[in-house]
From Swiss-Prot:
This is NADH dehydrogenase. Transfer of electrons from NADH to the respiratory chain. The immediate electron acceptor for the enzyme is believed to be ubiquinone. It comes from Ferdinandcohnia aciditolerans (strain JCM 32973 / CCTCC AB 2017280 / YN-1). NCBIfam families: AhpF. Keywords: Cell membrane, Disulfide bond, Electron transport, FAD, Flavoprotein, Membrane, NAD, Oxidoreductase, Redox-active center, Translocase, Transport, Ubiquinone. Its cofactor is FAD. Disulfide bonds join 337-340. GO terms for molecular function: flavin adenine dinucleotide binding; NAD binding; NADH dehydrogenase (ubiquinone) activity; NADH-dependent peroxiredoxin activity; oxidoreductase activity, acting on a sulfur group of donors, NAD(P) as acceptor. Its EC number is 7.1.1.2. The keyword Flavoprotein applies. Homodimer. FAD binds at residues 210-241, 469-479. Residues 184-519 are annotated as: Catalytic. NAD(+) binds at residues 349-379.
Amino acid sequence: MVLEPQIKSQLNQYLQLMEGDVLLKVSAGNDKVSEDMLSLVDELASMSSRITVEKTNLERTPSFSVNRPGEDTGIVFAGIPLGHEFTSLVLALLQVSGRAPKAEQNVIDQIKNIEGEYHFESYISLSCQNCPDVVQALNLMSVLNPGISHTMIDGAAFKDEVESKDIMAVPTVYLNGESFTSGRMTVEEILAQLGSGPDASELADKDPFDVLVVGGGPAGASSAIYAARKGIRTGIVADRFGGQIMDTLSIENFISQKYTEGPKLAASLEEHVKEYDIDVMKLQRAKRLEKKDLIEIELENGAVLKSKSVILSTGARWRNVGVPGEQEFKNKGVAYCPHCDGPLFEGKDVAVIGGGNSGVEAAIDLAGIVNHVTVLEFMPELKADEVLQERLNSLPNVTVIKNAQTKEITGDDKVNGISYMDRDTEEVHHIELAGVFVQIGLVPNTDWLDGTLERNRFGEIVVDSHGATNVPGVFAAGDCTNSAYKQIIISMGSGATAALGAFDYLIRNTTPAESAAAK
C-alpha cells in the first residue's frame, strides 16, 4: 500500500510535530489486509525517525498498537485506519509521542481522575463520518489514563466478529466485553455516561445572561457569535455542538467552500465560538421555558438558567416512520445514516423509505455496496431532483415502488423484512431483506415548548422578520422555525438575524445603565 502523494505530503508535515519516539507493535498474517497494513506502518516508519516497528502477537490479526518505548498505551487499530479514520491514526501518533491534546483542562482532569480498569472496543466503518469522534475520544482517554485502553475494529476486516455480535450500526462501543453505547459521542458524552461528567449544580449558580442561546448547530453558533460581538453576556447551552450537520457527509452548497464535511464544519463552528467570551454549556437539554421578570430555561438535570433574552435554535431530528418494528430494531437493521452503516450490509438486500433528495441519494450510495436496494415512496411520484432520479433509474440493482405505505418492519433479533401496502389496490406486500434506511425528512425539536409559544401545524416555531416569537424577548432561528427552506447557510443567516433582533430588544427594554453596559 502506497499513500497518495498529497496525503503523504500532509502527513509528513504532521509527523514533524511528534515530540518523542513511538513504537508500533504489529500483528500480521498472510492475508491481503495484513499485507496492506504492513505496507502502511513501514511507510510511516520510513517517513519519521521517531517511529519504529516491531512484530508481535495481538488479540486480533491484522492489527497494530501505538506505544511509547517501554510503555504500552492500550491504543490498538484492528484493520487499516484509512478513510475517515486516518486522522485518528495521525492524532494517536502525535498524542502518544507526547504532544499535548487539544482538550479543555477540566476534561483532561476528569479523564485522569477515573479509577479502575476500562477496556473499550469500538466497531467502525472507514466510510463513517461519525466514527472518528468516538475513536479519537477513546484514544485520548487511553493516552491520559493508564487504566483505560481502546481497540478500534474495522467491521469490514472483522466481518465474522461483527456478525456474531449482531452489530448493524456504527460506531458501536463495547466496554469490558459488554455493549456500552452506539452512535456519535464526544469525549464529554462518554465521560458523562461513565458518571464522570461535570456537576449540574455548577449551572444553577450562573449569573443571568443578556442572551442565552439554546442549541449548538449552525444557527446557534451564528447567534452566539453575533451576540458576543455586541459585548453582552452570552451563553450557549446544547446537547451537542454541530447539530444535524454532524450527520451530513458531503456539503457542497456552503458558499466559499467547494466541499466540506459536516463534522469538519461543526468543529470549525465550535472553534469560532470559543474565540469569543461565550459561556458554552454542552451535554445539556432544555426541558422548559418560562417568561418571568427574566426568561427561565430549565434543563433536564433540574438546573435553571436565567436570561434577559433567549434565542431558540434547537434544530431538527430524523423523522420516524412510526410503524411496528422501527424502534424495536433500531441499530439492528433499522438505520438512518447510509454513509455510516451501509458497509455493514455489503452484499445484502435493503430498503430505503423516502423518495426525496436524501432518500434517493441514500439509495444511490447503497447501490454500490449492497446486493439490491428497494426504494419505497408514499406518494405517486418521487420528490427528488430530476438529476438524482436519472442517476437512480440508471442503476441495475435498484427497484422503486411508488404509492407504497410502510406498514411494518419485521424481524426476530434483527430485521428480516418490510411490509408495505399498495395505496392503489390496498394489497399488502412483504419483502425479505436485511436492512431498512429511513429517509423521510426532519421534525423540529420543539416538543418541549408545547403551550409556551406559537408553533405551526408542523411544530415549527413561528417567527417574524427579526426572528422574534410571540413571547417578548424570545427569538428563534434555524430548522426549528417556520423558515421556508432548511439549509445550513440559511440557518446561519437566521441566527445572525435573531441575535441582532435580541440585541435591539435589549436596547429597548432595559434601563439606561443596562443599555449603556450592553453597548
